[in-house]
């Protein structure tokens, strides 16, 4: 009986390692990484909301894909897939309040944090919502996602 449980435990561990699941990350580390991601997403949202009306209205014409249902850290792959288009839109609409260097730094921070949170696994296939989102809706949705995951960890 014990052999069977041990073998099951080993098999499960191998599956987790094979799928690059973040096995060594403690809950506290995950919380800290989520806090960092939340901070960076909020900074982006604040930067977007501080644009003058013409630039903001131009940015709102770009549409982003959001997942149908994001409930787990693996769903961060969907955010990772939309980071490049997000970065390009932000570059197009830079302002004196939100410089290229700020955008690059925030996007780099987000990329690093996402990699830590979701692991290096990219086989997860995102199921996107049929409707696209504006840049502010997109950022708000991911902020809400992070807050939701964070609340389950506390």
Swiss-Prot record:
PROSITE patterns found in the cross-reference section: INTERLEUKIN_2
Gene3D superfamilies listed in its UniProt record: 1.20.1250.10
Gene Ontology biological-process annotations: adaptive immune response
GO molecular function: cytokine activity; growth factor activity; interleukin-2 receptor binding
Glycosylation positions in this chain: 23
A Pfam family that the UniProt record links to this protein: IL2
Name of this protein: Interleukin-2
């Amino acid at each position: 009986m014990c052999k069977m449980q041990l073998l099951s435990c080993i098999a499960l561990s191998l599956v987790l390692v094979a799928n690059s699941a973040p096995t060594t990350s403690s809950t506290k580390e995950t919380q800290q990484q989520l806090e960092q991601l939340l901070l960076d997403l909020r900074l982006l949202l604040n930067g977007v909301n501080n644009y003058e009306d013409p630039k903001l209205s131009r940015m709102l014409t770009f549409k982003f894909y959001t997942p149908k249902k994001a409930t787990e850290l693996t769903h961060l792959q969907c955010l990772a897939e939309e980071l490049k288009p997000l970065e390009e839109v932000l570059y197009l609409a830079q302002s004196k309040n939100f410089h290229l260097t700020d955008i690059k730094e925030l996007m780099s921070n987000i990329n690093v944090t996402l990699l830590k949170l979701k692991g290096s696994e990219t086989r997860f296939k995102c199921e996107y919502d049929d409707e696209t989102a504006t840049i502010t809706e997109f950022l708000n949705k991911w902020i809400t996602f992070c807050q939701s995951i964070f609340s389950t960890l506390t």
